[in-house]
Amino acid sequence: MITLLTGKKGSGKTKKLIDLVHGAVGTSLGNVVCVEKGDTLTYDVDHKARLVNIESYGIVGFEGLYGFIAGLCAGNYDITDIFVDSTLKIGGKDLNDLLVFLVKVKTMTDGANVNITFSVSADSSEFPEAIFKIAEIK
């Protein structure tokens, strides 16, 4: 399942994401991963979740982000939840590119049985219509 936490900058998406990470850590029977750009969440995310600074791996663009997430899933079948903060800062600002990315991620998550939540700094009214068929918008 794919979930998008949407809203303009400063609307509380990261706080919601942190709360969701903590909830997943408490209920998951597997591993929880939180991906961020930079190291701002170091003291906010529960230590039981694997916090990954994507900049440490030189990942840029939606293709790179897709490959990174696919690698996480392929390398660890115990991952139940992946949370990605600042998705547009990692992948790029083009919402049509986001749609193409989400289509690929949806195909992967359906087979891997992984829940992925992305924070997206954009109002949902700006999204291409097809995104609403792929992801749950919050």
Regions found by a protein language model. Name each.
Residues M1-G71, E126-A130:
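Conserved P-loop
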Residues T3-L5, V32, I79-V84, I116:
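Generic beta-sheet signal
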